[in-house]
């Protein structure tokens, strides 16, 4: 089966670091692009999961916790957005997946990248890791995957 046409091509998405009229969508995009997080993982991030001093984020998925290293640029971006219990919340409750996808879609459209999605941004994360000579096992661990099976197509 043929993968998407974007597979294998590393995109220049440096414009994502520029200011945006959709700051939440921008931060969602950066968390996926920089750390390979899933929208569901992003929506469950509590402010207490972020350790700004150590630039790490604790992510929980299916009862498994993992620690994600944050870049100093991303840590700075996160520090500007924290206020309540969750990173993205309304009245103390996390926003819905639909909200996250609308924010991401609006941001990607603003940056002229309407053809991208959460999945294609996660793929960009994987491609960047491979470019940096990281092993599939390390990438799988960082993504919270139990095995490298879903990453085999990148060999």
Residue positions per predicted region:
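Short, basic interhelical loop/turn and adjoining N-cap
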Residues: 49, 94-98, 145-153
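Short functional hotspots where side chains directly engage DNA or cofactors
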Residues: 55-59, 128, 137-155
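Solenoid-like repeat scaffolds
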Residues: 15-20, 48-51, 145
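Conserved tyrosine-mediated DNA breakage-rejoining catalytic core shared by Y-recombinases
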Residues: 35, 44-76
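Basic, Lys/Arg- and aromatic-enriched nucleic-acid-binding interface segment
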Residues: 2, 6-39
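Short, basic (Lys/Arg/His-rich) helix/loop patches that form interaction surfaces
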Residues: 102-141, 145
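Alpha-helix N-cap/helix-start motif at helix boundaries, enriched for small hydrophobics
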Residues: 28-29, 40-45, 139
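Active-site/catalytic core of tyrosine-dependent DNA strand-transfer enzymes
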Residues: 71-114
């Amino acid at each position: 089966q043929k993968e998407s046409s974007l597979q294998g091509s590393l995109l220049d998405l440096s414009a994502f670091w520029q200011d945006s009229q959709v700051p939440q969508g921008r931060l969602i995009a950066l968390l996926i692009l920089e750390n390979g997080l899933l929208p569901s993982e992003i929506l469950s991030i509590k402010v207490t999961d972020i350790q700004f001093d150590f630039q790490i984020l604790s992510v929980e998925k299916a009862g498994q916790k993992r620690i994600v290293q944050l870049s100093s640029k991303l840590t700075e971006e996160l520090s500007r957005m924290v206020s309540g219990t969750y990173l993205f919340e309304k009245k103390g409750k996390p926003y819905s997946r639909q909200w996250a996808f609308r924010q991401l879609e609006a941001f990607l459209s603003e940056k002229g990248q309407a053809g991208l999605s959460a999945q294609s941004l996660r793929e960009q994360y994987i491609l960047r890791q491979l470019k940096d000579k990281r092993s599939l096992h390390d990438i799988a661990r960082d993504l919270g995957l139990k095995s490298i099976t879903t990453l085999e197509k990148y060999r």
